[in-house]
Amino acid sequence: MNTLACIPAFNEEGVIGNLIKETLSFVDSVVVCDDGSFDNTLKEAEKSGAIVIKHNKNKGKGAALRTLFNYARDSQADIIITIDGDGQFLPNEITKLIKPIQE
């Protein structure tokens, strides 16, 4: 099953790169919505292997998630998960999260 991780992010350049790299160990692809960041979130996310969608101004987490869900719908992913961009979610928990869906 094709699994897509969706990450809304705002000014997360310090953690987004490692978060994406770790997440890619458990999913097929990662898409980040850079919600108007002033730092290098976009650059770090791209460098780490994510697809990045950029909001030119900060619209809030809800708008970032809406953008990500629209992308996910069009991507034909079988499983979609969301992870906050601040690094508080442990990517190694993804396996437990999606196991019931895969069964």
Which residues does each PLM region occupy?
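Structured catalytic core of nucleotide-sugar glycosyltransferases
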Residues: 1-103
